[in-house]
Each structure stands twice: as structure tokens, then as C-alpha cells.
């Protein structure tokens, strides 16, 4: 079994659709092995998105991700990373396939409901950024 990391972003939490997103996750066969609702500080968001620090959207992304609470998740499934990326859909909800989370719930490229690890290396950094081994079941 492979693990991946996911965030239900502030836009989704603000719109009270966390439960709908979780239903899609579990309905797709993912096991939630870690979950908590947190409010990131700007510094925590900057540390998490450090790989994007030179990108022009970095500051706006960190401000957005720290504006309100998020739900962080560790997910488990065969080929979890690829399966989660497929369920999320394209970054831009307008380009996402029907039935994906971003197509169903996303508002814009920034407010696209969810984040997900894009590689095993990313998951290996992202999961322990938010979860200790004791919190993963």
C-alpha cells in the first residue's frame, strides 16, 4: 500500500463542503490514516510550499493557505499518489474531467478545493510535515 498527502483547502472549508470531499475520497477506496483540522500560520505555509519560493505565485499561495483552517489528510491505497491526482483533477477546475473533486467543487486555479502530493518524494516530505508516526493509523 502506498500513502499520499492531501489538503482540503481553505476555500472548501469556508464553503462547508469538507464532508462532501471526504465522501468522494472514501468512495474512491482511500483509507484515511491521518486527519486533522488546523489553521496554518503564514510561516508554516511558507515552509510547506518552500519548493515554490521562487515562483511568482508563492506569496499569494501562502497567504491563501493561511487565511482560514484546512483539513490535512494522509491517505492510503494501492498507487495512492496517482489515484489521488486522478481524483483531484486538473489544477484549473475549468480543465478538470467530470466527476473529479476540482471539477465538482473548485472555483478557480487558486481556490481549487484540494492539494495533493505529486510524487513519492513529495509525500515523504508532506506527510511528516503535519503528522507524527503516532498519529498515523
Curated annotation (Swiss-Prot):
GO molecular function, one example?
ATP binding
Q: Which SUPFAM superfamilies match?
A: Nucleoside diphosphate kinase, NDK (SSF54919)
Which sites bind ATP?
9, 57, 85, 91, 102, 112
* A cellular component term, taken from the record's GO annotations: cytoplasm
Which co-factors does it depend on? Mg(2+)
Family affiliation: Belongs to the NDK family.
Q: What is this protein called?
A: Nucleoside diphosphate kinase
What gene does the UniProt entry assign to this protein?
Answer: ndk
